[in-house]
Amino acid sequence: MASSLIAKRFLSSSLLSRSLLRPAASASHRSFDTNAMRQYDNRADDHSTDIDRHSERSFPSTARRDDIFLRCVGSIFSDSEFEPGSEHDGPGHGQSVPLRVARDRSWRWSGRGWDARETEDALHLRVDMPGLAKEDVKISVEQNTLIIKGEGAKEGDEEESARRYTSRIDLPDKLYKIDQIRAEMKNGVLKVVVPKMKEEERKDVISVKVE
């Protein structure tokens, strides 16, 4: 009985690992200037919640949508801290994390050094990048994957002393306007706004006239 349970858990873990990993593609690549953002809502939210930095990376189909969003956001930035002499590649060292959000409610989740908030109009991300300037930050989208990279100047002669940051966020297809992403880098804080498509703008539902 015990050996059967172990085998099932191993198989499930392997399938999940393979489903999260996919090769990065150069096609459909978009880059965004960190000067492009014009506005950002900084209003406080009484429902801000700290996320467990060791959040699960599995997303069972039976889970509630708010639970899924909680785990996703917690995983996205779980390893994203700045420490000279180390490089952080986000969850799983290069793995992409699917971002699944509920469309009928607004959310805000935060942790040390980051904040993610969803409204009816957009997804708002704030990431602390102390020591980096806007020239050190690169934001791009490759096949619906939002990629945030930051690398500062070396401190001294050692190459490992440079501050580095990398995170990948898979955005649901046909839900966000990836060509209208806005970003602003100011005083070591990166703010990114990803506008959402309105229901009438989405083309995934086609009505067929019956004659």
Curated annotation (Swiss-Prot):
It comes from the Eukaryota. Keywords: Mitochondrion, Stress response, Transit peptide. Belongs to the small heat shock protein (HSP20) family. Transmembrane segments: none annotated. One of its GO terms (cellular component) is mitochondrion. InterPro entries: A-crystallin/Hsp20_dom, HSP14.7/HSP23.5/HSP23.6-like, HSP20-like_chaperone. This is Heat shock 22 kDa protein, mitochondrial. It is found in: Mitochondrion. Residues 105-211 form the sHSP domain. It comes from Glycine max. Residues 1-31 form a transit peptide.
